[in-house]
Amino acid sequence: MNWGFLQGILSGVNKYSTALGRIWLSVVFIFRVLVYVVAAEEVWDDEQKDFICNTKQPGCPNVCYDEFFPVSHVRLWALQLILVTCPSLLVVMHVAYREERERKHRLKHGPDAPALYSNLSKKRGGLWWTYLLSLIFKAAVDSGFLYIFHCIYKDYDMPRVVACSVQPCPHTVDCYISRPTEKKVFTYFMVVTAAICILLNLSEVAYLVGKRCMEVFRPRRQKTSRRHQLPDTCPPYVISKGHPQDESTVLTKAGMATVDAGVYP
């Protein structure tokens, strides 16, 4: 499998991600991809060859192995990693589509034409929805594979000995799994890292939705508050007595000097 191509995808989408998205990429690449390539494949390399049953009946070890390991851990993890990282490629493709559209727009209207996008990689409009749906899809894929692992391998356990009575075995035979403790440790490790990735994806979804809601409702709240604030267009005036000879009146603005409204000789 070409893991260099997968690394290129993860590196390309890193510049379009939030802080939580960068943490997710680090967890996927370091704790899942590298561990899978360096260690997991070596641990499960001898899974069928060293699956030994205490019988010489031809075909019995093969059917017993298929009974307890219908799908290999390694192949399930490989499929899971591919499906989890593919949505990140959609984000990169969406940004590339924006760049191509911007290039054609400038070729048609000239280099001084107003830009279609203020920031090509800014998560607005369709790119925001693409990024959000990619997060939901990644969380759903990891959750689905955890459920599949739980159904196939009960409680993610790896027993040392399994009892098999499948045809063509003549009777119930005991079969022994190679390196069960080591395989159990790696299984738990991959399950925990997948759960962490699910938590990071859901946290990023909450962050994006919350930030978007604040951007939408904050201007409305400020506009509503300005409507309720009445301007001081009619300052209060106080009427007081004016000149004692003609009994004129004086208009006095609160806090200011008096203004004589009468007529003086």
From Swiss-Prot:
Keywords: Cell junction, Cell membrane, Disulfide bond, Gap junction, Membrane, Transmembrane, Transmembrane helix. GO terms for molecular function: gap junction channel activity. It is found in: Cell membrane; Cell junction, Gap junction. InterPro entries: Connexin, Connexin-30.3, Connexin_CCC, Connexin_CS, Connexin_N, Connexin_N_sf. The keyword Transmembrane applies. Disulfide bonds join 53-175, 60-169, 64-164. It comes from the Eukaryota. The chain crosses the membrane at residues 21-40, 74-94, 131-151, 185-205. It is a multi-pass membrane protein. It holds the Pfam family Connexin. SMART domains: CNX, Connexin_CCC. GO terms for biological process: cell-cell signaling; gap junction-mediated intercellular transport; olfactory behavior; sensory perception of smell. Detected in adult heart, kidney, skin and cochlea, where it is detected in spiral ganglion, stria vascularis, spiral limbus and spiral ligament (at protein level). PROSITE patterns: CONNEXINS_1, CONNEXINS_2. Residues 2-13 dip into the membrane without crossing it. The keyword Metal-binding does not apply. Residues 41-73, 152-184 are extracellular. Residues 14-20, 95-130, 206-265 are cytoplasmic. One of its GO terms (cellular component) is connexin complex. Belongs to the connexin family. Beta-type (group I) subfamily. Structural component of gap junctions. Gap junctions are dodecameric channels that connect the cytoplasm of adjoining cells. They are formed by the docking of two hexameric hemichannels, one from each cell membrane. Small molecules and ions diffuse from one cell to a neighboring cell via the central pore. A hemichannel or connexon is composed of a hexamer of connexins. A functional gap junction is formed by the apposition of two hemichannels. Forms heteromeric channels with GJB2. This is Gap junction beta-4 protein. It comes from Rattus norvegicus. The gene is Gjb4.
